[in-house]
């Protein structure tokens, strides 16, 4: 089971379904605001989704705020290195807002308050190399995702889905030891906004403990800079302290927590927003 992707008007995109019990407005175009707001209300009335979650340009946020949406995060200079992006939410189910994972939130607050150790990982990485993945490897990629995630907000366990994403400006990268794929991740590139979401990190159980996510992230950053990308961001699991550490160590800024937002590994989890501005090389 996976959620549905809908395209609205001149380029707006939403994802919705019972898997995450939410609507996610992934992309908003100015001319589509009336149609998008109407569709969000229609889905709320028909499907009774517990949460509406929207990424919108700051200049287009007022109609959402007037309808009861609240800010949960933001990325400054997200759109072409100029305009801020706001992440706005409306909780139709009060319990989804109030039942916060207090233990996980406290662990993360402690992480933010402590100095991070910058460990030398070169010895761990000596046997690994990074390269961009190809369609012919989609089945192997899907197997690792299925091993790592019981459930995921997108059907990354499906090789056909991975191949389709490769055709739509999603770049997958793999860490190899010899010919064996040990870990992988993706960069979802939006050339219109000059941004990329660094996501879909997974490590085969036989290769954990080598900080391969950090190696992958560093390699993806270099690749994105070569493609003219200015803003990198991720939506990381609040519960995954190692993943949060990875982004903090590489200089990403924490910028908000999305409460009870995404179904991963069989349950609805809260997610942290991180971003980093980089100097595009072209």
What is the meaning of each model-derived region?
Residues 1-47, 53, 61-62, 66-67, ...:
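N-terminal charged segments
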Residues 5-22, 28, 142-205:
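A conserved beta-strand-loop-helix scaffold within acyl/acetyltransferase catalytic domains
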Residues 55, 70-86, 253-268:
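Conserved catalytic-core motifs of GNAT/GCN5-like acyltransferases
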Residues 126-141:
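A short beta-loop-alpha structural element at the N-terminal edge
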